[in-house]
């Protein structure tokens, strides 16, 4: 059986920074929704005990990234929590990368989440999604939302999740060919880091906003120009800390019309938001229970 799995992108429909911990982690309130677009991972388990990652060109990746880290963490947890011998837990992982790096679409976090969920099944370690989500915080704060796989209000540093249902819409995702480091953007002093935490029902009724957008627009003139252009036709803002911008539409035809107006030096992709992650859908289609 071919084990090819979705590693979907997300957008932050709103993102507020509500505080900062003594260790540098930021408290947030954000609304995550998944897209029917993203990377794919082909994961082939073996008993050699090694984790190997290959790119689209079948080149072996020699640097440690979120995928390798996730696989190694799962092996370690299985050893310490279950007393399982994990020396034979291995896999070849082939990454088909479509989500741009530094785009705010969550590619690295999504890759780690797909790795954890799929290897948990293939290695039969049988951890719950909640246990995987807690483990994933050792890698990154966005990963629990990808593991749980629902449209979600995210609070705390990413560990507090409130699943909600939201109307699925069409989006034009615009990548300005700029890669933005989340770590670097969080370090900028002028970003508002004390937005008052608000009740969820109030947030959902209010106009959505991203606390990073003003700083990003000042720092990157091209992003500011694209937001201004797209906002003439549809609600538009950055996702995450950028660089991608999304414009929201009620139908695909409207998104296609605005896509045709984009400058030639930017990439545009038309996608649809989904309330259930494509990764979870893939498990349902294979009749595999994620909630053991």
From Swiss-Prot:
Q: Which family does it belong to?
A: Belongs to the GHMP kinase family. IspE subfamily.
Keyword line: ATP-binding, Isoprene biosynthesis, Kinase, Nucleotide-binding, Transferase
What is the annotated role of this protein in its UniProt record? Catalyzes the phosphorylation of the position 2 hydroxy group of 4-diphosphocytidyl-2C-methyl-D-erythritol.
Q: Which residues does the entry assign to the active site, renumbered to this chain? A: 10, 142
Molecular function (Gene Ontology), one example: 4-(cytidine 5'-diphospho)-2-C-methyl-D-erythritol kinase activity
**Whom does it interact with, and what assembly results?**
Homodimer.
Gene3D superfamilies for the chain: 3.30.230.10, GHMP kinase, C-terminal domain
What's the EC number here?
A: 2.7.1.148
Q: Which reaction does it catalyse?
A: 4-CDP-2-C-methyl-D-erythritol + ATP = 4-CDP-2-C-methyl-D-erythritol 2-phosphate + ADP + H(+)
Tell me which positions the record assigns to the signal sequence: none
Task: Name its species.
Answer: Buchnera aphidicola subsp. Schizaphis graminum (strain Sg)
Protein name per the record: 4-diphosphocytidyl-2-C-methyl-D-erythritol kinase
In terms of InterPro entries, this protein maps to: GHMP_kinase_C_dom, GHMP_kinase_C_sf, GHMP_kinase_N_dom, IspE, Ribosomal_Su5_D2-typ_SF, Ribsml_uS5_D2-typ_fold_subgr
Residue ranges spanning the membrane: these are: none
* Top-rank taxon: Bacteria
The pathway entry for this protein reads as: Isoprenoid biosynthesis; isopentenyl diphosphate biosynthesis via DXP pathway; isopentenyl diphosphate from 1-deoxy-D-xylulose 5-phosphate: step 3/6
Q: Which residues bind ATP?
A: 100-110
């Amino acid at each position: 059986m071919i084990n090819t799995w979705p590693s979907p992108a997300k957008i932050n429909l709103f993102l507020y920074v509500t505080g900062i911990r003594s260790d540098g982690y930021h408290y947030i309130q954000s609304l995550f929704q998944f897209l029917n677009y993203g990377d794919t991972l082909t994961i082939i388990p073996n008993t050699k005990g090694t984790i190997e990652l290959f790119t689209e060109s079948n080149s072996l990746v020699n640097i440690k990234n979120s995928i390798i880290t996730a696989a190694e963490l799962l092996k370690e947890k299985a050893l310490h929590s279950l007393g399982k011998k994990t020396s034979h837990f291995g896999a070849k992982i082939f990454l088909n990368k479509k989500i741009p790096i530094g785009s705010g679409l969550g590619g690295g976090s999504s890759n780690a989440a797909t790795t954890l969920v799929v290897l948990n099944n293939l290695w039969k370690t049988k951890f719950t999604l909640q246990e995987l989500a807690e483990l994933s915080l050792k890698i990154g704060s966005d990963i629990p939302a990808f593991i749980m796989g629902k449209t979600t209000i995210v609070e705390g540093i990413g560990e507090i999740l409130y699943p909600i249902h939201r109307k699925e819409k069409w989006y034009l995702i615009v990548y300005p060919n700029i890669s933005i480091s989340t770590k670097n953007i969080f370090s900028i002093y002028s970003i508002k880091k004390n937005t008052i935490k608000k009740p969820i029902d109030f947030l959902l009724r209010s106009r959505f906003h991203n606390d990073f957008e003003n700083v990003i627009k000042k720092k990157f003139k091209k992003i500011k120009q694209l937001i201004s252009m797209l906002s003439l036709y549809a609600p538009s803002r950055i996702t995450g800390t950028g660089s991608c911008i999304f414009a929201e539409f009620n139908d695909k035809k409207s998104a296609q019309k605005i896509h045709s107006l984009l400058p030639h030096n930017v990439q545009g992709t038309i996608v649809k938001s989904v309330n259930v992650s494509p990764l979870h859908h893939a498990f349902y289609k294979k009749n595999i229970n994620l909630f053991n």
